[in-house]
Amino acid sequence: MEPETEGPPPTIPVTPLQQMIASCTGAVLTSLMVTPLDVVKIRLQAQNNPFPKGKCFLYSNGLMDHMCVCEEESKKAWYKKPGNFRGTLDAFLKILRNEGIKSLWSGLPPTLVMAIPATVIYFTCYEQLSAFLKTKLGENETRIPIVAGVVARFGAVTVISPLELIRTKVQSKKFSYKELYQFVSMRVSEDGWISLWKGWAPTILRDVPFSAMYWYNYENLKRWLCEKSGLYEPTFMINFTSGALSGSFAAVATLPFDVVKTQKQTQLWTNEYCKFPAPLDMSTWTIMKNIVADKGFSGLFTGLIPRLVKIVPACAIMISSYELGKSFFQKQNVESR
């Protein structure tokens, strides 16, 4: 009689609601841990080049980028507080010592209104699409992460894009609900519904390829590390490492589109706020050619290190905490079976 070989432990798939809870928890943890890096970066930028009224800057909570408009000429705004910082570490310590620990999360709550729903939609759609495609194509089909990642990101960006435009408008003008309704109605009547998706195209060009590369590399790297370790299920460190490496590769590969997206959206909102006449809307490829002509090919990779510093920990924390949440619910499902 042959000895029985131990197989993988029984698992029950997590429900969509459980996936939503896991992704929401991961989103909150990611934003709490990554936001201080961007707050320090923005404070240093504001110190070296003070933001004039109407100036736009990017704020990242680790989940998504948000366009913010400097609307206050006084020094009351969190990004205009004086600090006399000598560098990143000095800024971090002085903010902590002089302003309190809460200042490291300045500006976070309003951005989470968009970021958490976007993350929940994205991760839940990815999981549901992956499960569906596996039933049709098989468990080991390598194209599944690419297809699911592309469709999930496309959907999340499309849903959130008009809401983010409205959020930015409210933040820049302090509109009442009635004025906001009038703004949306006027915009739709003048330029059609498509005007609510301004800035959508460059975001899609950056985020969709990022998502495809990220999920493809993450799933394959996670599987490879499990095989090398002789494990059926990935550990927290395997998920963390796979997320960090996959995020860094995707961040480098899509950086040119990030440079273009930042330039287009900053110009768009500066014109909106200051009522400048709208310039000729250049395509992504035209902007890229102009950047190469002005700064050389390296201009397309401006800000590589800051992007990696932000993206790598965000990807690692988000995916590892999300997978941890899924593992918790899987155990609960098995026990309650």
UniProtKB/Swiss-Prot annotation:
Catalytic activity: glutathione(in) = glutathione(out)
UniProt keyword annotations, A-Z: Membrane, Mitochondrion, Mitochondrion inner membrane, Repeat, Transmembrane, Transmembrane helix, Transport
Domain of life: Eukaryota
Phenotype caused by lack of the gene: Cells lacking both Slc25a39 and Slc25a40 show defects in the activity and stability of proteins containing iron-sulfur clusters.
Localization terms from the record: Mitochondrion inner membrane
Species, as recorded: Mus musculus
Membrane topology of the entry: Multi-pass membrane protein
GO molecular function, one term: glutathione transmembrane transporter activity
Record protein name field: Mitochondrial glutathione transporter SLC25A40
UniProt cross-references to InterPro entries, sorted A to Z: Mit_carrier, Mitochondrial_sb/sol_carrier, Mt_carrier_dom_sf, Mtm1-like
GO CC term, one of those recorded: mitochondrion
Pfam family, one: Mito_carr
Record function comment: Probable mitochondrial transporter required for glutathione import into mitochondria. Glutathione, which plays key roles in oxidative metabolism, is produced exclusively in the cytosol and is imported in many organelles. Mitochondrial glutathione is required for the activity and stability of proteins containing iron-sulfur clusters, as well as erythropoiesis.
Family: Belongs to the mitochondrial carrier (TC 2.A.29) family.
Organismal lineage: Eukaryota, Metazoa, Chordata, Craniata, Vertebrata
